[in-house]
UniProtKB/Swiss-Prot annotation:
This is Large ribosomal subunit protein bL21. It comes from Sorangium cellulosum (strain So ce56) (Polyangium cellulosum (strain So ce56)). Part of the 50S ribosomal subunit. Contacts protein L20. One of its GO terms (molecular function) is structural constituent of ribosome. GO terms for biological process: translation.
Amino acid sequence: MYAVIKTGGKQYRVAEGQKLRVEKLVGNAGDKVTFSEVLLVGGDSPKIGKPLVSGASVAAEITGQDRGKKIVVFKFRRRKNYRRKNGHRQPYTELKITGITA
């Protein structure tokens, strides 16, 4: 059985036991989270939401907090000696899907 969930402005196809990296969620390692925004539940008898599947939820456990690779943002104006260099590391949360209820 699999499901499509929505979190952090993105959609993810998840299955039980799968490890996943999503946009940052508040919580520490070992905390339980529940996703109620389930768009689709697939399997023997798939359920498609309009837009959400009523009564469906996905349970997960936070396995860690992490940050992505650093990107460099560089702005400049030609001939004006204007330069700004900035770095950014996006925070992520690592999850393990523990259950899907439909």
